[in-house]
Amino acid sequence: MMRCQPLSLNGQLKENKMDKDFYKSLDLPVIAAPLFLISGPEMVIECCKNGIVGTFPALNQRTTEGFEDWVIQIKDALALFEKETGKKPAPFGVNLIVHPTNIRVKADLDVCEKHKVPLIITSLGAVPQIVDIVHNYGGLVYHDIIKKRHAEKASEAGVDGLILVAAGAGGHAGTLHPIPLINEVKKIFSKTIVLSGCLSNGNDIASALQMGADIAYMGTRFINVKESRAEDNYKDMIMQSSAEDIVYTAAVSGVNANFLRPSLEAMGITEEQWKDTKKINFGNTSDLAESEAKAWKTIWSAGQGVTSIKDSPSISELVPMLKEEFVFALDKQKKLLDTYT
């Protein structure tokens, strides 16, 4: 499989040695997003073996000890893969919920520091001290945002990249269209831009780069892979759904997120209830993990990109397909450009 060159579409990655080293082993400019309850070491390992960044939430393991076991499992599997094949796998990443009431965040960060996790994705808080710790061992920190104000705070914290969660993304999505969101953020941030929202095929990846992103962030597409921990009924519902079946509501967990309408209806949640809002209350870490898990286990999240998902391949089947579509889309764009020059 052809390797991607170090990305430099926006003139940033080629100037940052850490970024350049991080991405030189990619086959495709894609990060498989950390999916709550769904991403496990199996998915991360297969993503990295196939040349895209694999990630998972630290809270997918209920204890820090279990989390460390997963990190070790991933590192060992990727080291063995490189030894046996001579091919350097793509790097992996961990999502940390950086919130004052997450009492596990320091312990989980200590694990990341100990094992030098290449990429840390922070949510619900951009903390300079975390950035410093990760930079000291040579890692990168990306922070997910839904609006310019969040981007400004993350930029001040010194993060290496911003994940722009645009309208239509699965999970805790924003409400802004990707084009104005990218344009707003690029006014105040000159490092790596990662775009999330409705990216399900290779053409979508090419479109994300054309809009000004450096990397595509794909979540819903990876719910429907064989290595996913999602239930078969969940995968079937995604394949049967369209963009109109996605409901944006705070009724499930107190924070606005996108969910599958049939899943809400199956739990007896009415349209009136979708419009209810609740104040966010994370409680302690175990409460956060358990309460969120209970909600998201029975009510399934997905983005509007479901409209393009009609299968459930293995990651080793999906990545080459995405690459073929991506290359075809870029070639088509080049031919179109030639028409006007």
Language model: regions and residue ranges:
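Conserved active-site-proximal phosphate/metal-binding subdomains
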Residues: I179-T192, S200-T341
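Active-site entrance/lid segments in N-terminal catalytic domains of soluble metabolic enzymes
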Residues: L13-T192
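Gly/Ser-rich catalytic serine loop of serine hydrolases
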Residues: F36, S196-N201
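Generic low-complexity, intrinsically disordered sequence content enriched
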Residues: G11-L13, K17, E113, G219, ...
